[in-house]
UniProtKB/Swiss-Prot annotation:
The lineage of its organism: Bacteria, Pseudomonadati, Pseudomonadota, Gammaproteobacteria, Lysobacterales. It comes from Xanthomonas euvesicatoria pv. vesicatoria (strain 85-10) (Xanthomonas campestris pv. vesicatoria). One of several proteins that assist in the late maturation steps of the functional core of the 30S ribosomal subunit. Associates with free 30S ribosomal subunits (but not with 30S subunits that are part of 70S ribosomes or polysomes). Required for efficient processing of 16S rRNA. May interact with the 5'-terminal helix region of 16S rRNA. One of its GO terms (cellular component) is cytosol. This is Ribosome-binding factor A. It is found in: Cytoplasm.
Amino acid sequence: MPTKSFHRTDRVSAQVRRDLGTIVHAAVRDHGLPSVSVSDVEISRDLAHAKVFVTALQQERSAEAVKGLKEIAGQLRTQLARAMKLRHVPELHFHYDDSVDRGERIDNLLRDLDDVGPEATSSDEDAEQR
């Protein structure tokens, strides 16, 4: 019976994402930063570095949010160390996760195709066959 292997980095990533989500939520409020949420965390094999991917509720202020998080990364790491029982807490590197924006754009394009309807696409195909 095969079992799925779980690597330590996967478990630590999930825990960091949960704990950091709460910490970041409070920090953006305290520092007056645009509201963000932690969407994913990738941790290096040696657990020394963590890429923290965040999404901003206001896309136009995403650069400001990431810049602010990078400035307070040391404070966030200290709070994360208090919340987690790790000997070494990874260094935090914040990145904007644009996958939500790309997904929304694709969704809008698909919706626009639905608005065009099948009549327009069939007349286009008829014109191409001529």
